[in-house]
A protein has these predicted regions:
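Active-site nucleophile and cofactor-binding loops and adjacent substrate-binding regions
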Residues: 1-6
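A generic, well-ordered mixed alpha/beta core segment in the N-terminal half of proteins
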Residues: 8-64
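Ferredoxin-type iron-sulfur electron-transfer modules in oxidoreductases and energy-metabolism complexes
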Residues: 42-176
Length: 176
């Protein structure tokens, strides 16, 4: 099951050799058959990565992302009541950058596209999303170290800056 809106990442598949298929900026659930010509051969495969082992057929285990998030993808410092957190002023450029990082849906296309199976784009997006905001600053260093350590522990590869992750990301998350 998936959201059919490109916001949950559960539909993650390789279609004709590309994570999420041939369209740019779209997830698998947003790819329609009308994109293909009559008689085309369509190859559908599960993600290919040691970090996402195949469970059965096209289903992969993506709980590694959950484990990375559990290692530090949250803010635990007290910011007051919910309305108090909303009163913290954040400059627009920083808020925009944090929102861009928050657009990562954790689908795994970056890992599937990377020849090393690196989850660095996912981890950096989640770390940036939280570390840019005032509420996340007190735990910024600990968060980054914990999430990177968990990524390494789970067997994801290292980044070699080929930018394949960025090219295949359906939400256009940038490595910079």
């Amino acid at each position: 099951h998936d959201c059919r809106e490109g916001i949950c990442g559960m539909c993650s598949l390789y279609i004709n050799g590309h994570p999420h298929g041939p369209a740019t900026g779209a997830t698998t659930c947003q790819i329609y058959m009308r994109r293909f010509n009559d008689g085309d051969t369509i190859t559908v495969e599960p993600w290919r990565s040691a970090g996402f082992p195949v469970i059965k057929d096209l289903m992969v285990d993506r709980t590694a992302y959950d484990k990375i998030m559990q290692a530090g993808g949250y803010v635990s410092v007290r910011t007051g009541a919910p309305q108090d957190a909303n009163a913290i002023l954040i400059p627009k450029p920083i808020a925009d950058e944090a929102m861009d990082a928050a657009s990562c849906i954790g689908c795994g296309a970056c890992v599937a596209a990377c020849k090393n199976g690196s989850a660095m784009l996912f981890v950096s997006a989640k770390v940036s999303q939280l570390n840019l905001l005032p509420q996340g600053k007190p735990e910024a260093l600990r968060r980054a170290k914990a999430m990177l350590s968990k990524m390494d522990e789970l067997g994801f590869g290292n980044c070699t800056n080929t930018r394949a992750c960025e090219a295949e990301c359906p939400k256009n998350v940038s490595i910079s």
